């Protein structure tokens, strides 16, 4: 079965959360990449501040590790308000959400990560809170139970999700500002790596930052994780400075190739090429061939390979593209 701690997985692992917090930009002007999103946010935030209003509710969605939590914190900083953070699975009962809402001050940001995992009971409480800044709660039980409304101060709900399609339509419709985060280009990732190295007090040159960036799968969280491992290699095997030579050898040692693929990515592509003549191959057959569950292939391995154009998902099954053959220096049969 697939390792839970693949070096190039975008989900949080180990000390990621602590390190990410230390390296997070605090303001939009410090934030690198996502140019369209950044430009939109600058306008929305300035308009809300000019009107002395709470910012409209915001849904941030996209693959993991791209900075959804960071953006939520930047919004609070730019608005000059407090932020309270939680996640969908934590809010099990209506009372859990009510406790958070009643402790908000005017203009505050409530950040809910994995908002697609909210229970229906909690979601029902959220609707009037988002629309009318009111909280409907039940007092008492049985025939004596009655509903009362509590007024809430204007606040901004920022929801984050990797699966926007899993949100119910009523919840999705209540977000006035939907923002999609895209994978980062190598230039922006190089800037992020350089900034993180400065925060960590590391010596790194432009080529060293580029080498780490191009193997980071378009994801800042992976870039920062690889930077920490390259630092270890540089300190033990060299003088601590990160150059292209040092980064290249460190990442080769870590089995992260020039495209950011690891053993499992290559195993999947080679199974399609060698065992199924390039495809198409059904998901169940592919899962059996590489000894993985179909959900692991769909949710963990495939997305980046498809996004980068190395495999295709068709009605008849998975196909290895010409780019996959080129990666292994093979000739795609006609």
Curated annotation (Swiss-Prot):
EC number: 3.6.4.-
Region (Head domain (RuvB-H)): 258-334
Region span, Small ATPAse domain (RuvB-S): 185-255
Stored CDD domains: AAA (cd00009)
Substrates-to-products reaction catalysed: ATP + H2O = ADP + phosphate + H(+)
Binding-site list for Mg(2+): 69
Enzymatic class: hydrolase
Region (Large ATPase domain (RuvB-L)): 4-184
GO molecular function list: ATP binding; ATP hydrolysis activity; four-way junction DNA binding; four-way junction helicase activity
Summary of the function given for this chain in its UniProt record: The RuvA-RuvB-RuvC complex processes Holliday junction (HJ) DNA during genetic recombination and DNA repair, while the RuvA-RuvB complex plays an important role in the rescue of blocked DNA replication forks via replication fork reversal (RFR). RuvA specifically binds to HJ cruciform DNA, conferring on it an open structure. The RuvB hexamer acts as an ATP-dependent pump, pulling dsDNA into and through the RuvAB complex. RuvB forms 2 homohexamers on either side of HJ DNA bound by 1 or 2 RuvA tetramers; 4 subunits per hexamer contact DNA at a time.
Protein's UniProt name: Holliday junction branch migration complex subunit RuvB
Gene: ruvB
């Amino acid at each position: 079965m697939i390792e839970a701690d693949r070096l190039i997985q975008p989900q949080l692992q180990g000390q990621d959360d602590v390190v990410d917090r230390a390296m997070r930009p605090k303001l939009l002007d410090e934030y690198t990449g996502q140019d369209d999103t950044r430009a939109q946010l600058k306008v929305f935030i300035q308009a809300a501040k000019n009107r002395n209003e709470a910012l409209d509710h915001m849904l941030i969605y996209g693959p993991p590790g791209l900075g959804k939590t960071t953006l939520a914190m930047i919004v609070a900083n730019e608005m000059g308000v407090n932020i309270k953070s939680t996640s969908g699975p934590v809010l099990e009962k209506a009372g859990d959400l009510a406790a958070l809402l009643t402790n908000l001050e005017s203009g505050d940001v409530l950040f809910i990560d994995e908002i697609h995992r909210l229970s229906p009971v909690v979601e029902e409480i959220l609707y009037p809170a988002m629309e009318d800044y009111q909280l409907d709660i039940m007092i008492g039980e049985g025939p004596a139970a009655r509903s009362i409304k509590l007024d809430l101060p204007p606040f901004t709900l920022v929801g984050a999700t990797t699966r926007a399609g899993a949100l119910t339509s009523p919840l999705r419709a209540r977000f006035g500002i939907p923002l999609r985060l895209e994978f980062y280009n190598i230039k922006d990732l190089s800037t992020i790596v350089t900034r993180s190295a400065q925060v960590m007090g590391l010596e790194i040159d432009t080529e060293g930052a580029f080498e780490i960036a191009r193997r980071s799968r378009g994801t800042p969280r992976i870039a920062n994780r690889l930077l920490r491992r390259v630092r270890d290699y540089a300190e033990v095997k060299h003088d601590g400075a990160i150059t292209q030579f040092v980064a290249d050898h460190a990442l080769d040692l870590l089995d992260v190739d020039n495209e950011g693929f690891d053993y499992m990515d290559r195993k999947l592509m080679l199974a399609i090429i060698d065992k199924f003549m390039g495809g198409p191959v059904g998901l169940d057959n592919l899962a059996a061939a590489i000894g993985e569950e179909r959900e692991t292939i769909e949710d963990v391995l495939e997305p980046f390979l498809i996004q980068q154009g190395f495999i295709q998902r068709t009605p008849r099954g998975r196909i290895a593209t010409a780019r996959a053959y080129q990666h292994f220096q093979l000739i795609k049969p006609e």
